[in-house]
Structure formats: structure tokens, C-alpha cells
């Protein structure tokens, strides 16, 4: 009996053949040369019926292929949300799947996992809120579920630094409403205003008390980092001073 046919049946969603092969004694966790199981392929296709059949037959929802991917991770990457409830009920690595969903902008999957009680930790020193700081919908969702808006990544950046760097005014406003320190400095001594290069972001940060002339570890102000002419103009109009940094270099003011 060639149990590799179980893999082919899962790839094609052939439920009758799957059932027969399982009844004949094939392991539901047979692997191909890539370390992938029938459940992996069913999850990748988003085949709810086949996923349910394999899990009931004892398939391991936590089996990883040679790239380290589990069925729930590949389902999330493939945006097959329908199978996530089945997989998340018995799978470990759901937090990893949550990061994958957020990274791919899969709002529905993120909402589902948060609603089931999955709470993100930090991945490589980066919180989930740092990761999605350019996506207002996900920022709002994570804040609603109590994710820390003041978390710092490995470089000392907060989500507000990241939202400013993304020039996402909606994200910046959502975070500012949570009351973070608008002048918090990262490991380079930069405040969120140092990263903002969008007029709307700059206006929001200043409205909440950002220091126009804060200096970083190199003695540079936000004006030194302004690459957009309108952003530079907004800073100057509100009182930014073109002072030299610690190397004696003045800001280069871009034109509009």
C-alpha cells in the first residue's frame, strides 16, 4: 500500500480516497520529501472538510515541514481563514500564526485569534504592535485588545516611533490617544518626531507636545532628518531651529 497517495488525495481534496486509505492503515502524518503532511496540504488549500477529517483521524496539527512551518502557519500565509478555527483548537504555535497573519495584513485572522485569547509576546524583540504600526486597522484592533502601546523593541523604539516612521497619521493618532510619552527616545536618542516625514504626522505629534528641537545622540534635531519639503516647512513654521549637530553640520532643508 502506497501511503504517498494520502498526500496526493489531500492535495486534491479527495475525501473518499482519504477515508479509504486511512481505514486501510495509512498514517495521517505521512510526510513527503519536504516534510509536509496531508494536513499541511489541506490547510494550504483551505479545505475545511479535509482538515476536519484528518484531525479526527489523529493528524498532528503541530508537525513542521523542513522550513519549520506548521499547518496553521501555512493556512495563515495562504490566507485560508476558514480552516484556522479547526487548527487553532489543537495547535501550538498559534502565536507564531498570529504574527504571520499580522505581517500579511490578514485582519480577519488576527481578529479571530485575538478573540480566542491568543496574546502576542515579542518576536525578535519586536512586539506585534511594532510590526503593524503602518496599518491603522490592526493598530486599532490590537489597542482594543490591550496590547501595550509603550513596548520597546530591541532598538528602543516604541510603536509610536514606528508609526511615525511609516508616516501613518491614523496610526500616530490612535497611539497618541493612549497617552504615551510623545518625546520618548529610542536607542539612537531619537523621538518619534525625528522619524516623521509627513505633515499630518508632524502636526499630530506637535499637538501632543512633541519637542521641535529635541536632539539625538548625534546632536541632530527632527529638522536634520526631514526629507520632504513640506515636512521641513511645517517644522520651520512651528519654530524649529536650524542648529548644527555635534559634527557642525546644519540641516539640509529640502525644497517643496
Swiss-Prot record:
* Pfam families named among the record's database cross-references: Ank, Ank_2
Q: SUPFAM superfamilies in the record, alphabetically? A: Ankyrin repeat
- Where, in residue numbers, are the ANK repeats? 1-30, 34-63, 67-92, 93-122, 124-151, 155-184, 188-214, 218-245
PROSITE patterns according to UniProt: ANK_REP_REGION, ANK_REPEAT
What UniProt keywords apply to this chain's record, in alphabetical order? ANK repeat, Repeat
Q: Which InterPro entries match?
A: Ank_repeat_dom-contain_49, Ankyrin_rpt, Ankyrin_rpt-contain_sf
Is Repeat tagged as a keyword? yes
Annotated Gene3D superfamilies: Ankyrin repeat-containing domain
Q: What is this protein called in UniProt? A: Putative ankyrin repeat protein PAE1861
The source organism is: Pyrobaculum aerophilum (strain ATCC 51768 / DSM 7523 / JCM 9630 / CIP 104966 / NBRC 100827 / IM2)
High-level lineage: Archaea, Thermoproteota, Thermoprotei, Thermoproteales, Thermoproteaceae
Amino acid at each position: 500500500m502506497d501511503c504517498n497517495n494520502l498526500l496526493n488525495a489531500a492535495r486534491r481534496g479527495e475525501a473518499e480516497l482519504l477515508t479509504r486509505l486511512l481505514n486501510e492503515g495509512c498514517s495521517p502524518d505521512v510526510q513527503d520529501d519536504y516534510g509536509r503532511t496531508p494536513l499541511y496540504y489541506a490547510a494550504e488549500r483551505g479545505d475545511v472538510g479535509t482538515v476536519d477529517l484528518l484531525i479526527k483521524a489523529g493528524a498532528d496539527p503541530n508537525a513542521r515541514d523542513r522550513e519549520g512551518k506548521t499547518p496553521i502557519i501555512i493556512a495563515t500565509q495562504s490566507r485560508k481563514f476558514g480552516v484556522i478555527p479547526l487548527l487553532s483548537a489543537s495547535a501550538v504555535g498559534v502565536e507564531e500564526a498570529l504574527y504571520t497573519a499580522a505581517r500579511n495584513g490578514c485582519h480577519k485572522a488576527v481578529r479571530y485569534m485575538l478573540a480566542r485569547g491568543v496574546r502576542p509576546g515579542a518576536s525578535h524583540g519586536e512586539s506585534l504592535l511594532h510590526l503593524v504600526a503602518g496599518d491603522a486597522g490592526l493598530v486599532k484592533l490590537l489597542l482594543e485588545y490591550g496590547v501595550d502601546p509603550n513596548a520597546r523593541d530591541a532598538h528602543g523604539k516604541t510603536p509610536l516611533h514606528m508609526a511615525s516612521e511609516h508616516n501613518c497619521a491614523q496610526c500616530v493618532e490612535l497611539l497618541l490617544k493612549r497617552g504615551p510619552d510623545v518625546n520618548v527616545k529610542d536607542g539612537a536618542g531619537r523621538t518619534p518626531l525625528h522619524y516623521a516625514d509627513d505633515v499630518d504626522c508632524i502636526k499630530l505629534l506637535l499637538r501632543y507636545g512633541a519637542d521641535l528641537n529635541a536632539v539625538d545622540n548625534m546632536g541632530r534635531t527632527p529638522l536634520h532628518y526631514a526629507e520632504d519639503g513640506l515636512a521641513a516647512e511645517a517644522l520651520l513654521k512651528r519654530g524649529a531651529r536650524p542648529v548644527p549637530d555635534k559634527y557642525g553640520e546644519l540641516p539640509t532643508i529640502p525644497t517643496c
